[in-house]
Amino acid sequence: VHWTAEEKQLITGLWGKVNVDECGAEALARLLIVYPWTQRFFASFGNLATASAITGNAMVHAHGKKVLTSFGEAVKNLDNIKNTFAQLSELHCDKLHVDPENFKLLGDILIIVLAAHFGKDFTPDCQAAWKKLVRVVAHALARKYH
């Protein structure tokens, strides 16, 4: 994947402002609410029966932070995303059996969360760069499935 200097700047510039705890929790909660079938991968998280139960669930918050923290590794390693996510791809494929389509869904949700949090700073060019990034990350996570 080739990144232009502008794309790199748009991604890293916005990432520096992201509250990983808040945005991570919100992104995972939105995934579980908007795409309820994804809840089956989080059965050990307890009550996910309602939107308020999901948004108030400490395990959802903790895992959302973990997911977004790991996403930060992509931002730090834009030129080596495949290798950065090799172990996570293996884990999600071989042990967790996560449908790789869910990585794309989470990427789409992350775009919505970033747009909501950053408003005017999340310009169309910024959105395009982030859309490219979430697709590259989703592809890297799905790599072991192919």
Swiss-Prot record:
Red blood cells. The keyword Transmembrane helix does not apply. One of its GO terms (cellular component) is hemoglobin complex. Residues 2-146 form the Globin domain. It comes from the Eukaryota. The keyword Cytoplasm does not apply. Keywords: Heme, Iron, Metal-binding, Oxygen transport, Transport. GO terms for molecular function: haptoglobin binding; heme binding; metal ion binding; organic acid binding; oxygen binding; oxygen carrier activity; peroxidase activity. CDD domains: Hb-beta-like. Heme b binds at H63, H92. GO terms for biological process: hydrogen peroxide catabolic process. InterPro entries: Globin, Globin-like_sf, Globin/Proto, Hemoglobin_b, Hemoglobin_oxygen_transport. Involved in oxygen transport from the lung to the various peripheral tissues. Belongs to the globin family. Heterotetramer of two alpha chains and two beta chains. This is Hemoglobin subunit beta.
